[in-house]
Structures are given as structure tokens and as C-alpha cells.
């Protein structure tokens, strides 16, 4: 699963997900892409589940790019802990996505297979997604 090798700070603020994606919103490597339609957090497990579903569907055909990276740590406090005594310890990593962010790109397969594979991966995501084709 994806996670940073090292970070400057161990804990992050939760932040706000306002507006639409201005970067990472175009299909730039492959011919087909999976685009988000709403804001959300994608965990490294969800990103990996989508990748596995697509590679399994395409039977390792074509080429696949993952365009998002989970670089935000999410902290969780232990169960039945009293308030105070600092922030919890980092438990997992998330990628913050805005509407319009391209999650995956694919090349080297037919449009029908790409659409079906992206649809399978979209079911694994916590946000609504859409299949997009590269603008020529």
C-alpha cells in the first residue's frame, strides 16, 4: 500500500475540501481516466483495491497509472481514552481529492475494457466517479 517514506510533520490538521481541482484534472499519461465528481478522502487501502480490481479485470493488459498519492496522516485515539493528553497516533494515510481529480489512467486496452475496468474500480471508491477519455 502507498505511504510516504518520510514526512516533515507526523500529524496534520483535517483541513477543508473547498472548490474543484485545478491541478491533476486532465488525462495526461494514458488514453482513459477515472475522474472524481465529489470531494473526499481516499485511503491507501481503497487506492490499492481499485488498482487490484483494474489489473485483475484487464488480465494485466495495458498500462496503468495511479495519479493520487496518500500523503495525509489520519490519527485515531485509543478506545475508552479520556479527553486531553494530545492528539492520537497516526493510523493510516489518505489522499485528499476534489471534484475533477483524475485517480487512475489507462492505456493499451480497448475503450470497452477500459470503461468496464474503471467502473469496477469506481465501486471501490468512497466518492462518485466518472470515466473520461483523453482530449486529442
Swiss-Prot record:
HAMAP family: Ribosomal_uL16. The gene is rpl16. GO terms for biological process: mitochondrial translation. PROSITE patterns: RIBOSOMAL_L16_1, RIBOSOMAL_L16_2. It comes from Mesostigma viride (Green alga). Belongs to the universal ribosomal protein uL16 family. Keywords: Chloroplast, Plastid, Ribonucleoprotein, Ribosomal protein. NCBIfam families: rplP_bact. It is found in: Plastid, Chloroplast. This is Large ribosomal subunit protein uL16c.
Amino acid at each position: 500500500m502507498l505511504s510516504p517514506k518520510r514526512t516533515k510533520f507526523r500529524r496534520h490538521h483535517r483541513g477543508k475540501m473547498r472548490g474543484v481541482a485545478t491541478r491533476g484534472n486532465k488525462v495526461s499519461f494514458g488514453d482513459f481516466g477515472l475522474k472524481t465528481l465529489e470531494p473526499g478522502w481516499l485511503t491507501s487501502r481503497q487506492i490499492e483495491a481499485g488498482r487490484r480490481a483494474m489489473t485483475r479485470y484487464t488480465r494485466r493488459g495495458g498500462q496503468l497509472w495511479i495519479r493520487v498519492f496518500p500523503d495525509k496522516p489520519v490519527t485515531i485515539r485509543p478506545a475508552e481514552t479520556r479527553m486531553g493528553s494530545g492528539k492520537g497516533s497516526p493510523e493510516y494515510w489518505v489522499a485528499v481529492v476534489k471534484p475533477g481529480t483524475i485517480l487512475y489512467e489507462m492505456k493499451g486496452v480497448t475503450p470497452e475494457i477500459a470503461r468496464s475496468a474503471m467502473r469496477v474500480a469506481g465501486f471501490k471508491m468512497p466518492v462518485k466517479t466518472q470515466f473520461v477519455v483523453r482530449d486529442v
